[in-house]
Amino acid sequence: MQNSHMDEYRNSSNGSTGNSSEVVVEHPTDFSTEIMNVTEMEQSPDDSPNVNASTEETEMASAVDLPVTLTETEANFPPEYEKFWKTVENNPQDFTGWVYLLQYVEQENHLMAARKAFDRFFIHYPYCYGYWKKYADLEKRHDNIKPSDEVYRRGLQAIPLSVDLWIHYINFLKETLDPGDPETNNTIRGTFEHAVLAAGTDFRSDRLWEMYINWENEQGNLREVTAIYDRILGIPTQLYSHHFQRFKEHVQNNLPRDLLTGEQFIQLRRELASVNGHSGDDGPPGDDLPSGIEDITDPAKLITEIENMRHRIIEIHQEMFNYNEHEVSKRWTFEEGIKRPYFHVKPLEKAQLKNWKEYLEFEIENGTHERVVVLFERCVISCALYEEFWIKYAKYMENHSIEGVRHVFSRACTIHLPKKPMVHMLWAAFEEQQGNINEARNILKTFEECVLGLAMVRLRRVSLERRHGNLEEAEHLLQDAIKNAKSNNESSFYAVKLARHLFKIQKNLPKSRKVLLEAIERDKENTKLYLNLLEMEYSGDLKQNEENILNCFDKAVHGSLPIKMRITFSQRKVEFLEDFGSDVNKLLNAYDEHQTLLKEQDSLKRKAENGSEEPEEKKAHTEDTTSSSTQMIDGDLQANQAVYNYSAWYQYNYQNPWNYGQYYPPPPT
């Protein structure tokens, strides 16, 4: 009997609905879908028993759900409203500006101004549960009960794990629903069920469970109370021991037949009769066993029977409690490390971030899928502005639910992290994996329009088009990047990318050469352009490309590069003619030209020694350039790959998992 109860507990500790005289256990087929439904409010109070919104309510919900833009009404807004509004309109990430705006509209008690402010605020910060409460209270103060109810529903859709918001909403229902309406209790019970489904597995959800138990006690529904305890005693929570103590009081203070369903009561009596060897008049076995204990006429036996049943009920739940206590002990240290379980724009301490990472790893390794998802949901409230946790969440969901992955990415990118590139790029990559090429294309395009100038995003768009055979579009994207570049360096960077695309992918050497030559005309001091042009020419028929290669060398040697770089290119020109040249005269001329450059360098050195040294700033820049470029040129140019760091176009100091730090790796030494 003990083992069967324990197995039942492990499989269904959180499944009882508590809505009937018997314990009904339901198992969602896919908790990924279940929690997704909760966060989308498909499991909203709207679906509670006997809660049917009228057409008027639906229209009001739509009106409240959208930002209010009533031009005529805005003329009558409070005098300082426009000042506060402009601050957040110009910078929606100014959280302090939002706080001042919301405080102002609350003080002014201007409903339309408040609606506009709150509606816009929640587009950016839906996890601020306290402001949902303020908004709902504001509507209620104006006797707008239906809009107030709708605000609560929207808040619970945005943050379904908020125990506080659920409690506030249930209290709101208790205050506003008609106690004389026979459907009121069903509505409240249905809301309690949605609350514990969404937030009941939170380690700090004890107040919600206590509230549910107390309410059922007030209604005199002792069997419902027992059903709730059957669930909470199997969930690791902060006050797990307190719940067990209250459960024992519940059992001791009430008769077993009032605590259990008829089926449970009969099963328990049979078990006790079997253990005690009862037969005949003491306890008719089999189907003839009565549902009550009225057949026991001896008061002493009656008391003994009741106490035995109470003892057995507690014994069964003691085993559940012991198992749960073990689960709590494994998580206690992690839970103590969570100092800020709610959302805030201020950065979290490193210790708390580390604690979240370790807690998630522990739960992934040891917990059920349901517990992992709930912990992730808790984590992305506290760490909503840290894309690493959203990415980790999405990666975890890949093995459980494709729609779940999409749901996580969508929430992260469209609400909490609209300007973080990595999570958008991973979302696009995920959609591409699923064959949703247009969706991947739109994600990258939309993000690039939101955050301009990120090379990593433009290159991802190019590679997406290339992978799917849209070579002209890939070329167009690079040409557009060159055209709209903010500097010569940026333009040259994209020119190299375009040239290599044309040469390696489209096999169009003349067009590739033209791109680099035009780039050199714009940016004559950029060593990387010459290197890439040479590498490209070296990749073809050297005899056929001899003139083009020599022209490239001449551009570098006679151009505006530092003397040290010009000498290096000159030396490589001599080596090229020595190894592959067809005209000895060109070789001799190149040698003479090289000697002239060496003399020029000696002359500059003597001037520097005599006090005519070039400005320190320019010298530092020159040495920087020549040092890095010389390293690239040393060795076989055919193997050389031009290094080009474009971290200047990466904002936010992102570490790039695709190692975009260089154009091409340098040759092995």
UniProtKB/Swiss-Prot annotation:
Residues 1-10, 599-624 have a biased composition (Basic and acidic residues). Signal peptide: none annotated. SMART domains: HAT. SUPFAM superfamilies: TPR-like (SSF48452). It comes from the Eukaryota. Keywords: mRNA processing, mRNA splicing, Nucleus, Phosphoprotein, Repeat. Residues 11-23 have a biased composition (Low complexity). GO terms for biological process: mRNA 5'-splice site recognition. One of its GO terms (cellular component) is U1 snRNP. InterPro entries: HAT (IPR003107), TPR-like_helical_dom_sf (IPR011990). The keyword Flavoprotein does not apply. Residues 625-634 have a biased composition (Polar residues). HAT repeats lie at residues 109-141, 143-175, 183-218, 220-253, 333-365, 367-399, 404-436. The modification Phosphoserine is found at residue 44. It is found in: Nucleus. Residues 1-23, 599-634 are annotated as: Disordered. Belongs to the PRP39 family. PANTHER family: PRE-MRNA PROCESSING PROTEIN PRP39-RELATED, PRE-MRNA-PROCESSING FACTOR 39. Involved in pre-mRNA splicing. This is Pre-mRNA-processing factor 39. It comes from Homo sapiens. The lineage of its organism: Eukaryota, Metazoa, Chordata, Craniata, Vertebrata.
